[in-house]
């Protein structure tokens, strides 16, 4: 696939690795004959390591077929995470090192997960934008402290720690943004 045909979300092969395109910048310099250049911000699949590369419009990058299968987290098998396909109930097993820091967002029965599959092999997961987690440990609210909006640390049921507003108490369910790792509101 030529560089000028690539769109955000495409998966390509580059330098022996597989990458998903997340951002594209197009530039047409005036000084050297008007050759259009494309700068791709791409992340490795699996792993999510960011790479920045520039290409001419005619450069060829082989496209890779990536399937996104909607799944539910089923259980943990030792250090591996097992996800169940929502349509055909195919189990997908991914090692903890592939899941990485996203493990702190995964709870029993979590839905809305997309398992990314290349050649029938699961290679990565894409989590929902927000997940609901329970606060298991946080300091109590200070009396009269509602005039200022001071965040305080809170330990969640997955072992993750985030900063929450002072009014959040132990046992409350909160929404956490999986992209930033920040408090996103109270859960219903």
Swiss-Prot record:
Disulfide bonds: none annotated. InterPro entries: Elong-fact-P_C, NA-bd_OB-fold, Rib_uL2_dom2, Transl_elong_fac_P/YeiP, Transl_elong_KOW-like, Transl_elong_p-like_YeiP, Transl_elong_P/YeiP_cen, Transl_elong_P/YeiP_CS. SMART domains: EFP (SM01185), Elong-fact-P_C (SM00841). One of its GO terms (biological process) is peptide biosynthetic process. SUPFAM superfamilies: Nucleic acid-binding proteins (SSF50249), Translation proteins SH3-like domain (SSF50104). GO terms for molecular function: translation elongation factor activity. GO terms for cellular component: cytoplasm. This is Elongation factor P-like protein. It comes from Xanthomonas euvesicatoria pv. vesicatoria (strain 85-10).
């Amino acid at each position: 696939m030529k560089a000028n045909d690539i769109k955000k979300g495409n998966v390509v092969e580059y330098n022996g690795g597989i990458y998903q395109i997340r951002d594209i910048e197009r530039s047409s310099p005036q000084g050297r004959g008007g050759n259009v250049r494309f700068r791709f911000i791409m992340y490795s699949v699996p792993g999510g390591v960011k790479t920045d590369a520039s290409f001419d419009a005619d450069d060829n990058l082989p496209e890779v077929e990536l399937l996104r299968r909607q799944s539910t987290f089923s259980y943990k098998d030792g250090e591996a995470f097992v996800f169940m396909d929502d349509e055909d109930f195919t189990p997908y097993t991914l090692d903890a090192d592939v899941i990485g820091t996203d493990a702190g967002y995964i709870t029993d029965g979590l839905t809305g997960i997309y398992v990314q599959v290349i050649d029938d092999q699961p290679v990565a997961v894409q989590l929902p934008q927000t997940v609901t987690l329970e606060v298991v440990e946080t300091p109590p609210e200070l009396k009269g402290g509602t005039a200022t909006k001071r965040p305080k640390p809170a330990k969640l049921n997955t072992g993750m720690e985030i900063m929450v507003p002072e009014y959040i108490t132990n046992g409350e369910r909160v929404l956490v943004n999986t992209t930033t790792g920040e408090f996103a509101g109270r859960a219903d």
